[in-house]
């Protein structure tokens, strides 16, 4: 396909026009009085949202240079969302301000590479200042405040704080659609996986159709069990101990299954067989997780262990196991704490190294099962459009709350960024590097200005007022009052604010150092087919 090329100022201005169109659509959502944006969908009802990354993803521009500019800013929003789960609108506003100020200096003759170095040094100094300002999250109320701001709903914030309190910071909080109106929280203690009993005859409570085993032995096998002769030596040892048995295997079938069922029905021996969760390598990993959590060993011929030779020392233990037809929950596994912590560290390292969103999600589920627990927030709404929007807000708020626990909290509402500009007094830069740092200092005002504008106030006046207030004091845009932001619960996770600034600066540096843009040449629309002859579709 033929290409078109733009150079110098023409190239940079083309990129800037695209960035401005995207940023102007996104920034109207910033702050407590930010508006919503309606997104048309090819199928189904339109989506109404105030989430920056969702809006950015929908924008496709016609002009090839503008399209590239918009795509670069989409990357800012996406990267911030991936890392911190929130702050996408702030990142977009910062990027727009940095690029605008930087391009003005480039047009005036500043060296783009020196500007880039100045921007990078300034951003590093501000990021360090933000982390120094950050206060550790100490109370459930602080988590609730942070999540409430992200979701623009105090009920959602309180529910997320409740969920995090129950499952811990490593636990998984998932959001599901509910058929009922309102919000519900469902908690699962211990490890849960989505495989239930192989036969309904294993149920111990026929009314609820679930099997409950107290203080059972747990046999973990990475293969099918069909021959009862392989299982008998171990069954006899477990029966002598007087404890029930949970068997987790690829499958239990044939005479092995019928022997277990018959003994359960007669009351001779209490046991339950369930299929192993997952497939392939993921199944091996999950069986390993169960073994470490329960203090058992995976019996697999790959490591030279055979079922017929297995003793009680290879079995895991737990305080309680509850099995339904769809899922199994293991409570208080008897695994060694050091081994469990080692497994947690290993899974966390795999998450950091994974490039696939799907793999990362599955690894997060494994991490939650090993380290914490699982909480499910069920969200309902009057219409499908509202339900989608609400679910998305809750997912963002969950990630926001986790970011707050990770790196602490700073004053929200754009105040932390503005007041971090005090670090510029200590920066000793000269020439165009100093000009680059000055562009960052000016850009730090942009989020607060935009929040004020969206609240119907004069941005410049608000910035000057907040600049002269004590550290941590700023504008509560919801009421128009100047308050102590942290005392009022107007908080942002330090990780969100820091990521927004770093990602915005990264893209701004690319804009400023661009000297040429190469894009696909737009194809001319094909000429329409000529119309038929008069009466050409009539029968004679």
From Swiss-Prot:
Q: Which InterPro entries match?
A: Chaperonin_Cpn60_CS, Cpn60/GroEL, Cpn60/GroEL/TCP-1, GroEL-like_apical_dom_sf, GROEL-like_equatorial_sf, TCP-1-like_intermed_sf
Q: Which Pfam families match?
A: Cpn60_TCP1 (PF00118)
A single Gene Ontology CC annotation of this entry is: cytoplasm
**Membrane-spanning ranges:** none
Q: Name one GO biological process term.
A: protein refolding
GO MF assignments: ATP binding; ATP-dependent protein folding chaperone; isomerase activity; unfolded protein binding
Q: List the disulfide bonds.
A: none
Asked if the record carries the keyword Cytoplasm, the reply is: yes
Keywords noted in UniProt: ATP-binding, Chaperone, Cytoplasm, Isomerase, Nucleotide-binding
- Keyword Zinc-finger appears in the UniProt entry: no
Catalytic reaction annotation: ATP + H2O + a folded polypeptide = ADP + phosphate + an unfolded polypeptide
Q: Which major enzyme category is it?
A: isomerase
| Known role | Together with its co-chaperonin GroES, plays an essential role in assisting protein folding. The GroEL-GroES system forms a nano-cage that allows encapsulation of the non-native substrate proteins and provides a physical environment optimized to promote and accelerate protein folding.
Q: Which NCBIfam families match?
A: GroEL, PRK00013.1, PRK12849.1, PRK12850.1, PRK12851.1
Quaternary structure?
Forms a cylinder of 14 subunits composed of two heptameric rings stacked back-to-back. Interacts with the co-chaperonin GroES.
Q: What is this protein called?
A: Chaperonin GroEL 2
The organism encoding this protein is Streptomyces albus G
Organism lineage string? Bacteria, Bacillati, Actinomycetota, Actinomycetes, Kitasatosporales
């Amino acid at each position: 396909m033929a290409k078109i090329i733009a150079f110098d100022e023409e190239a940079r201005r083309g990129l800037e026009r695209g960035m401005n169109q995207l940023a102007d659509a996104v920034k109207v959502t910033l702050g407590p009085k930010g508006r919503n944006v309606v997104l048309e969908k090819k199928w189904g009802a339109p989506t109404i949202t105030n989430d920056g990354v969702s809006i950015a993803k929908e924008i496709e521009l016609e002009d090839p240079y503008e399209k590239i500019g918009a795509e670069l800013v989409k990357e800012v929003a996406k990267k911030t969302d991936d890392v911190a789960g929130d702050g996408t609108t702030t990142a977009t506003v910062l990027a727009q301000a940095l690029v605008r100020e930087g391009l003005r200096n480039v047009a005036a003759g500043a060296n783009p590479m020196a500007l880039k170095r100045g921007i990078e040094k300034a951003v590093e100094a501000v990021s360090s200042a933000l982390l120094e300002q950050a206060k550790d999250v100490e109370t459930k109320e602080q988590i609730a405040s942070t999540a409430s701001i992200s979701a623009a709903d105090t009920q959602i914030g309180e529910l997320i704080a409740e969920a995090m309190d129950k499952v811990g910071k490593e636990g998984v909080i998932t959001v599901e659609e509910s058929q009922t109106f309102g919000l519900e929280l469902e908690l699962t203690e211990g490890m849960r996986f989505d495989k239930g009993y192989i036969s309904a005859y294993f149920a111990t409570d026929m009314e609820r159709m679930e099997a409950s085993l107290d203080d059972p032995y747990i046999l973990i096998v990475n293969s099918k069990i069909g021959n009862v002769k392989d299982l008998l030596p171990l069954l006899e040892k477990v029966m002598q101990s007087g404890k029930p048995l949970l068997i987790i295997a690829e499958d239990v079938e044939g005479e092995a299954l019928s022997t277990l069922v018959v003994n359960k029905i007669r009351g001779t021996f209490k046991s339950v067989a369930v299929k192993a969760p997952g497939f392939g390598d993921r199944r091996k990993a999950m069986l390993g997780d169960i073994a470490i959590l329960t203090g058992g060993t995976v019996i697999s011929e790959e490591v030279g262990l055979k079922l017929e030779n297995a003793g009680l020392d290879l079995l895991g233990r737990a305080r309680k196991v509850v099995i339904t037809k769809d899922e199994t929950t293991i409570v208080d596994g008897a695994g060694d704490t050091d081994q469990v912590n080692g497994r947690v560290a290993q899974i966390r390292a795999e998450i950091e190294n994974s490039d696939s969103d799907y793999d990362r999600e599955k690894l997060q589920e494994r991490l939650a099962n090993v380290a914490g627990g699982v909480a499910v927030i069920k969200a309902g709404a009057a219409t499908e459009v509202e339900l989608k929007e609400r679910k998305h807000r809750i997912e963002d708020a969950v990630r926001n709350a986790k970011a707050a626990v990770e790196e602490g909290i700073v004053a929200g509402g754009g105040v932390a960024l503005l007041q971090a500009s005090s670090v510029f007094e200590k920066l000793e830069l000269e020439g165009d590097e100093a000009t680059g740092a000055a562009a960052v200092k000016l850009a730090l005002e942009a989020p607060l200005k935009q929040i004020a504008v969206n609240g119907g106030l004069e941005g410049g006046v608000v910035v000057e007022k907040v600049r002269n207030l004590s550290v941590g004091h700023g504008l509560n845009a919801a009421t128009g009052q100047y308050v102590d932001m942290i005392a009022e619960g107007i908080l942002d996770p330090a990780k969100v604010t820091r990521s927004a600034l770093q990602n915005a600066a990264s893209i701004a540096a690319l804009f400023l150092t661009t000297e040429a843009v190469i894009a696909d040449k737009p194809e001319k629309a094909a000429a329409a087919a000529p119309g038929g002859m008069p009466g050409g579709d009539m029968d004679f």
